[in-house]
Every structure is written in structure tokens, then in C-alpha cells.
């Protein structure tokens, strides 16, 4: 059930391959895993999970190649016009975010888990970064290094590509603002995973945890989700409509787009 369970922060802990640290440090190569995977496919009746995993091996190499192609991406947005989107940063809210003290239980639980284990599944990584860039409206250049320090599987090419994608600064990917309440309900309906990581909520009903309407039962929220999401959408789409933006996006697509046809 790799395809189904990989989205859940609790289920993915045992259903994902957990090979990423080995790829990062070279103790196991992607080539070894790829060859072993191809050897195993003919022996299986249900091949969907392995095919899904195989795609992610391709993506690994694709994202790493982006940074090799353009090393400046460590500091500059893939779409250069996006560097003017977020120019100021707030150390106080960034610190609360990285420690898991934002006032949103599911997000904070994910950050507590990541701080403790050095790993969390892809969907939650995307949600964490999306919140920092859209709801907190912080420059990805300030939040990305702090997040990178937490990962035992930190791979610069993948990390920076995903950070920029979840921050809406690639120019070729649609902006995606994750709903914290929806992810909370979808990924941890009972709220038990959250309560294990945030024991102060052990006696709180799951529906209140998901809605984050906890009043004095939990930490104050550092942002208003609806207001901050609207602000971010207006800002991002405000520049995406211009002719100049589309021309620059075309350059990015030709250089980095994964669906570009090659002779």
C-alpha cells in the first residue's frame, strides 16, 4: 500500500522505502535500487506500488539535475521575477515555525516529528514549506536552510527544487496553498498521532484539534489562515498575469521543464 500510505505522516513511516538517507550519503546507490526493482517487477502480480516508487527514482534524478544545471538556484528563484515577492522576514515567527509552535496542531505535530526523527513524508514536507512561504509570507531563502538542517536525507537538488515549487517561485508550477485543517482531518482523522506528539491536547476532541479552534487550550496562532492565504494568492497571481512573467516562465520551462520533448 505504498501509494495509499505514503501521504500519511504516521503510516508512511513504515510504508515508504526510507532509503533517502542512503541515497544522500551513498551507502546505497539509486542504480542498485533501480536494478533490483526491475528484477522484482516480473515476479509480482500487483505492480502499481513499485511503478509508483520507480517514478520517484526518476524524479530524484530530475530534481538533482536542476541544481547541477543552474547552481544559482540555491539563492535565486527559478523565475527571477519572483525574488521581488517576499523581501522582508520575521525572525520571531520563523523560529516558532521551525520549533513547531505555530498554534496549528497538525502542522506543529509534523514539525515536532521532524525535529525528533530527521525525516517526514513528502506531502508533509510540502505542507510545511507551503505554510512558511504563503501563510507566513517569508522568503524561502530564509526558511529553506533551517528546514534543511533537520533532514537526515538532505539532498540539495531535491530540497531546493521542492522549496521553490512549494513557494510558487518556479514560474512553471501552479501555486498550491495547503489547507492545514483539511490535511489534519485527511491524514489523522482520530487525532491520535497529533496527541502523541502534542500531549497537552490528549483530552481535546479531534474535531477541535482539526479546526484549530482551541482558544486557551493551545498556543496562539501566528497567522490567520484565511486572510494570509488570500493575501498570498493575490500577490502571486498579481505578477503571474503579466506578459513579462510569461516570457520568463517560458525560459524556465525550456531549461528545467520535465515534459520537454528532446530529439
Residues of each region from the PLM?
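C-terminal catalytic domain of photolyase/cryptochrome flavoproteins
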Residues: 5-263
